[in-house]
Amino acid sequence: MRFEELDHTADVGIRAYGATLEELFENAAAGMFSLIVDLETVKPRGEVEVRVTADDLEGLMVNWLQELLFLHETQRLVFCEFDVAIKGLDLTGRARGEAIDKRSHELRLAVKAVTYHRLKVDPEKGVAEVIFDI
């Protein structure tokens, strides 16, 4: 299992799993986009590169997901595949997907923001939890 949805009053969250830190970040991104759209309907037609940095792993997770959410909102993109490289607290990621097409993409939730509320990134246990404002 790559990720699962978490119940949270008034908001929504995901619990992501990964054997490596990079996989944890990739699966968190997939989990976030699964809240937005059915990932099975998204084709990897284009690719964007994302670079973020932070002071700690939790901040790195928020910055990574928030940057992807920014691209979703401003460029009307949805993503289905993610590759991440992390060195220290610098992340370089690639997200593959396509422009939103109302004929093939039924949008689910409007995720407004990535929050620090109950945020957890635990690479030793291979789990991360993220709550989103909707």
Language model features with spans:
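N-terminal intrinsically disordered, cationic/polar leader segments
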Residues: M1-I134
